[in-house]
Amino acid sequence: MDTSQVSVSSQAAQRQVRVQLTSKQEDIALPDNTGPILVPTGLKRYALSTLVNNLLGNDKPIPFEFLINGSFLRTSIDEYLTANGISAETTLEIEYVRALIPPLHIASFEHDDWVSSIDVLSTSSPASAGSDAIARGQERILSGSYDGFLRVWNMSSQVIATSPSPTDGGHISSIKAAKFISPSSIASAGLDRTVRLWKYTEAEDGFSGKIVPQVELYGHKSGINSLAVHASTNRILSASADHNVGFWSTKKSDAPAAPESLLPSAASRTSKRRKLNASVSVSQRGPLALLSGHTAPVSDAIFDARDSTVGYSVSWDHSLRTWDLVTAALVDTRTTSHSLLSLQHLPDHNLLATGTSARHITLIDPRASAATISAMTLRGHTNAVVSLARDPHSIYGLISGSHDGTCRIWDLRATKTDKGGAVGESVYSISRKSLEEEGKANSKRVGGEGVKVFSVCWDREVGIVSAGEDKRIQINRGEGVLSSS
């Protein structure tokens, strides 16, 4: 090695910097009177973790991650100082958090066909807000399948209830979206172009239940790809292949009449109710509004997480659109370079996460004052990103489901900067258990063939629930996967 290189390396090892170690998690925080500590700039994460454990006097070491200016330290302190033009004379504020806890496989529930959509009912899920009907340990999972049936499962992988057949008020084609509205009501939609509302009841013992059709909502002229529910305002958004976003009421009395041209039979045009058989009749209603503007199939639509009068939608036309749901007016359009397939609001960061056909996730600031369209790009998937969900434990966490057969967990603090701007890499990847059971855990399926993930949900009690082409619901759980600080 060149003597000058040896000298530079030696100087880096000998350099020191004052660091102020802090944590927002009270149970691992150092005493308030802990002042700045002089440490070698050559230290990396492992050495810093050892230092903090020694200062805390831990008998059993806790693995820590370290953040400087909101980003994880992935190099030595010296390399960080050099890359960011910071003097070693500066007192460096370093925050530490518990390191990632990998989510473990808990269970898998098998279906007869592809599972397109899942939702969870738990004490913390949106559908149970204001209700004491769900107790811890009585969580339910709702699945929608390509076989046209809804199923409600308990946590022991038992099917408690199944929706009726088409002749008894069920879907007549594949289901693409299913959501709990409340502990006693469900919404679903699919390739039969209808949004359907259901009453859900359980027997007292909790081992059996019924899914009974209540209302059929007509308005779309092509299949429906996704649903979003805002229970407290009795509203639903639907994203359809007909290029429109549907805006609906879950209250039959608030909904207008169904468009006669879209009703399934000539007989129904003379009646508000369709007689299915001697015991079943289902009300038919129309949309509050159809939001027009997209020029290609709409893949996803959601409510603003903090303002239910605002909606967002994404489409194969490469655009993200913002809607005023009070006036049904288009407010803003952000155009990207790729088809957008999934959508999730990150309100604490004023960002919308959009899954793309180009295998990455683009974070977009929807505010009119935003200078650029893309605030950050998350890279790691090898096929289309079709489902997104927020981490219920951390404002920095996000999970994605992809046609590559994996779910990836992202921490918005785990970023780096390249010529294209801020780029994030996933902190954990969850593969399909079905591959492992086939003895093919390390084999790569081209494009995720046979194991494509179609839907993912992240619930505080149940964990990470995903479903897809392998005809399974898969549950993974890790307590506090990401730090919430």
UniProtKB/Swiss-Prot annotation:
Q: Does the keyword rRNA processing apply?
A: yes
Which parts of the sequence are annotated with region: Ubiquitin-like (UBL) domain?
17-98
Q: Which InterPro entries match?
A: G-protein_beta_WD-40_rep, NLE, WD40/YVTN_repeat-like_dom_sf, WD40_repeat_CS, WD40_repeat_dom_sf, WD40_rpt, WDR12/Ytm1
Keyword annotations of the record: Nucleus, Repeat, Ribosome biogenesis, rRNA processing, WD repeat
Q: Where does the UniProt annotation locate this protein? A: Nucleus, Nucleolus; Nucleus, Nucleoplasm
Which GO molecular function terms does the record list?
Answer: ribonucleoprotein complex binding
Q: Name one GO cellular component term.
A: PeBoW complex
UniProt keyword Nucleus present: yes
Q: Where is the composition biased (Low complexity)?
A: 255-268
Q: Where is this region: Disordered?
A: 252-278
Repeats (WD): which ranges? 110-163, 170-208, 219-258, 293-333, 335-374, 380-420, 448-485
Q: Which GO terms describe its biological process?
A: chromosome organization; maturation of 5.8S rRNA from tricistronic rRNA transcript (SSU-rRNA, 5.8S rRNA, LSU-rRNA); maturation of LSU-rRNA from tricistronic rRNA transcript (SSU-rRNA, 5.8S rRNA, LSU-rRNA); protein-RNA complex remodeling; ribosomal large subunit biogenesis
- Which family is it part of? Belongs to the WD repeat WDR12/YTM1 family.
Please give the HAMAP family that the UniProt record associates with this protein: WDR12 (MF_03029)
What is known about its subunit structure?
Component of the NOP7 complex, composed of erb1, nop7 and ytm1. The complex is held together by erb1, which interacts with nop7 via its N-terminal domain and with ytm1 via a high-affinity interaction between the seven-bladed beta-propeller domains of the 2 proteins. The NOP7 complex associates with the 66S pre-ribosome. Interacts (via UBL domain) with mdn1 (via VWFA/MIDAS domain).
Function noted in UniProt: Component of the NOP7 complex, which is required for maturation of the 25S and 5.8S ribosomal RNAs and formation of the 60S ribosome.
Protein name per its UniProtKB record: Ribosome biogenesis protein ytm1
Species in which this protein is naturally found: Emericella nidulans (strain FGSC A4 / ATCC 38163 / CBS 112.46 / NRRL 194 / M139) (Aspergillus nidulans)
Which taxonomic lineage does the organism of this UniProt entry have?
A: Eukaryota, Fungi, Dikarya, Ascomycota, Pezizomycotina
Q: Which gene encodes it?
A: ytm1
